[in-house]
């Protein structure tokens, strides 16, 4: 089965929904596909409030922001196909292959493509890391915030970036005991506003430490604890500093890597940008890649905050609509300048400045 559309947006997270809404505002025909059973992406896991300025949704919870964007896309007539995987890209003009509900295939022939496929959690290999009970922080967040399922009784979190800190606090909100946070660096890695919450809650902080081993329970059905140790200035474990921490869940929060599978299939040029999570598609200020008509936005173009993903989605949506002749150059420039003003504000400070430089 074949389908023609003006703009295909792959991914219905913060970036993808924003791109779709922005393009549809100018009259573009937009199809959004997502492998999940509802749109919103990571926003529906985020029960915490955004902070910063009102322009950047300060005081709004991610879950509420996701709901608002769904209402907007419905009003604009954006078509959304859920439970749908984009699994193939054919540069010879045959289109983008989609698996629809796992039962039938569909080839979409879009004039423009916006890839907003997000990022995946990084694994951390150590003895016992494949045991039940060693869980990614994102999976923990999904269980407690989306499905309302307790992940365990006592959690040890490995990694103190924003994800590790936020999920730790959300575990406490869910009534789950936290055994501590383990961080190899000499200080916590995330924003002070998140670090302050876990400090005030009395969570033990093992900075300058690493996990050595997950200790299995008697029948190997899970974990009963972890062995951690101090590290030297080369991040190597210091013999004799090992200690046992009792827990039945070990959360892994050691960063994210952009999902570049589809850009790779499309033969988009990739560049190494460690501050953005590894290889990312090269793109210009319109979020257009080295392949004309293919745009990227959000974490798939470099890992940042959800607020940045929203703004990048807007840029891609405006640019795609302009390329289709839905918006004149002057109006498009004004709209993009407003978005860039917002993005530049987000990419300031000790964390944002590094991402700003990497994007440049």
Language-model features: locations:
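Residues forming the flavin
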Residues: 1-360
